[in-house]
Amino acid sequence: MSIYSQLKQILIAKRCGAFALIDPDIKNDGALLETVEKINNSGFDAILVGGSLIQDNNFDTRIEYIKDNTNLPVIIFPGSSKQLSGKADAILFLSLLSGRNPQYLIGEHVESAPVIHSLNLEPIPTGYILLDGGNRSSVEIISNTIPLPMNKVDIILAHALAGQYLGNKFIFLECGSGASNHASATIIESLYSRLNIPIIVGGGITSSASAKLISNAGASFIVVGTHIENGASVEELQEITSSI
């Protein structure tokens, strides 16, 4: 069964799933095993691996290490076309719809597509929408794009619909790692009532209350990353995953 089919099965079994995000940078190597074990015991459905900037050439090695220490699907969440590995189970094939930088609308995709094909890596087309989470994110800086303001719900919806009509399998609302705010319930509800594809929401999710709010608004998957990296306990993470 494809990873995409497995994700759809998760949504049949329960209202909302949870992804754990691992930043596979050298600065996190010392805590990588502890992080993976924590994720394994916290009720997550899959692991996303990727970051805006990786400072060495060991992405493939870290993917293999994560795979060796978990039974969860490992999905690449790429910050660039260089973040590829045949050892992963799938890759979110991201188009940064909220920006107008052609490198992240099609450039990175053209560069990565032949490699993805040669690796026999399952691509999952995903429309990626960067929202203003209250502080300047690494995604904003690296991609040289401006996030959409959260009070412009109609503009966010238009981008999401465009992503759906282009054939994306998911819409990913992103406020950025360590965001002060997560995507609002108003935004999620607006998209949920009009889209026919699942919504992933990441950035600023640090409590069961925020996770439940996002889930109730219509998100299909939440993403927790910085909260894990900052030392959240298994019990705290279980509260989040069980609340949805």
Residue ranges: model-predicted function:
Residues 49-54, 90, 94-105, 175-178, ...:
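Glycine-rich phosphate-binding active-site loops on the catalytic face of alpha/beta enzymes
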Residues 63-69, 226-244:
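C-terminal helical cap(s) of enzyme catalytic domains, especially alpha/beta-barrels
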Residues 83-164:
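Conserved anion-binding
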Residues 34-35, 76, 80-93, 190-224:
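Catalytic cores of alpha/beta
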Residues 18-22, 47-49, 74-76, 91-93, ...:
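Hydrophobic faces of well-ordered beta-strands that scaffold small-molecule active sites
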Residues 1-22, 26, 112-125, 132:
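N-terminal amphipathic alpha-helix/helix-capping segment at the start of soluble metabolic enzymes
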Residues 16-32, 78-80, 130-156, 201, ...:
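Active-site mouth loops of central-metabolism enzymes
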Residues 141-188, 228-231, 236:
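Glycine/Thr-rich beta-alpha phosphate-binding loop at enzyme active sites
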